[in-house]
Amino acid sequence: MAKEPARVKRRERKNITSGVAHVNASFNNTMITITDAQGNTISWSSAGMMGFKGSRKSTPYAAQMAAEDAGKKAAEHGVKTLEVNVSGPGSGRESALRALQAAGMTITTIRDVTPIPHNGCRPPKRRRV
């Protein structure tokens, strides 16, 4: 009794013309998620997913590669215009924006949604190198 091979469900092509790109640029990695207006994920990518490891994940080039990848995947679903929400203090913020434009997306608005504490938790102590 041989088990029949599992059928791989193909991703159906969504016809969405506009979306929201969430760029999360931390000190260690850059993650780009492209969603529709309701927040359902269309495509996503990160610097680590592109094969960068360790401290190379936090570079602007890694963020550029991740944004290009997420933009190409979203373009397959018909996304042409994007609103961009940028979050975090990382070095890949601007390069991710430029890469999304280079991937053929029209950027309508850019919003900085970095959470700023109203004197919340104590930050980690300064590094002494």
UniProtKB/Swiss-Prot annotation:
Q: Which residues form a coiled coil?
A: none
Q: Which GO terms describe its biological process?
A: translation
Supply one GO molecular-function term: rRNA binding
Which Cys residues form disulphide pairs? none
User: What keyword terms does UniProt attach to this protein?
Assistant: Ribonucleoprotein, Ribosomal protein, RNA-binding, rRNA-binding
For this chain, the family text in UniProt reads: Belongs to the universal ribosomal protein uS11 family.
What NCBIfam families does the database record attribute to this sequence? PRK05309.1, uS11_bact
What is the purpose of this protein? Answer: Located on the platform of the 30S subunit, it bridges several disparate RNA helices of the 16S rRNA. Forms part of the Shine-Dalgarno cleft in the 70S ribosome.
Q: Which PANTHER family match?
A: 40S RIBOSOMAL PROTEIN S14/30S RIBOSOMAL PROTEIN S11 (PTHR11759)
Name by which UniProt lists this protein: Small ribosomal subunit protein uS11
